[in-house]
Amino acid sequence: SKTVKNLFLAGQINGTSGYEEAAAQGLVAAIGILKKETLNISSLLTRGNSYIGVMIDDLVTSHLDEPYRMFTSRAEHRLFLRNDNVYTRLSISFEKLLSKQQAQKINTYMGTKEKISKNLKNSSIKNENVMQLLKRPETSINNYSNSSLKKLPFYNWASFEIETSIKYEGYIENEQERIKKLKSLEGLTIPKNFDFKKIKTLSNESTERLIKIKPENIGQASRIDGIRPTDLIALSSFVKNVSRET
């Protein structure tokens, strides 16, 4: 709480609805209580590294007309926010919260991951690097890992993260490129009398706000409370297509 020192709130009082949302806020509140002098939660949990970070950012920056629920569509980095890479995403940031046993377990996992990655980078079949081969949907990392690698601790988990990251690599790069383009499209003009209902990927909440405020460009749309980054990407893409047709 900004007005009462050492008062940490979670759940409906913050404008959310749902057990998962409340549990996530409870976790953040607990961390805040235990580590408020040594950890800055807002800098550790961001839109780019966690769904909790997305939720917190939405709650503190947006005006809520209805109870908040966390959906994957709210996260612009959702292809990166996967359960298989949680150690890679968050372990370094939260190392102060880990016990020695937990830290050792994660270090072992990261070591296994590094060994598997190094082996793949140095392996080729018919002059084609294995990392490139794994981008194909029909390939599996198990086909290119030797028996000694498969005996490493946490091999299954580490190899799954590596393979998923390789197969998603192109999509993640495209996602990052779209986000960069969005920042450069703030001046893109939205035609007068534009029918926002034609954009089927927009949430009903976002559509209603856009119709009500009628922004003149993408920059104005980005400053409307409740408009998500994913909404802006869809809107800018649709507006550009309309401009080409006319």
PLM feature spans:
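Short alpha-helix boundary/capping segments
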Residues: 18-21, 82
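Short FAD-binding loop at a beta-strand-to-alpha-helix junction that anchors the flavin cofactor
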Residues: 1-18
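Active/binding-pocket-proximal capping segment
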Residues: 25-30, 228-230, 238-239
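Internal hydrophobic alpha-helix adjacent to the cofactor/substrate pocket in enzyme cavities
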Residues: 22-44
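Short arginine-rich
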Residues: 35-41, 120, 230-237
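Fold-independent oxyanion-binding glycine-rich loops
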Residues: 10-13, 27, 73
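Extended, charge-enriched "interface" segments that sit outside catalytic cores
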Residues: 74, 80-82, 86-87, 91-95, ...
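Mid-to-C-terminal Rossmann-like scaffold of FAD/NAD(P)H-dependent oxidoreductases
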Residues: 39-104
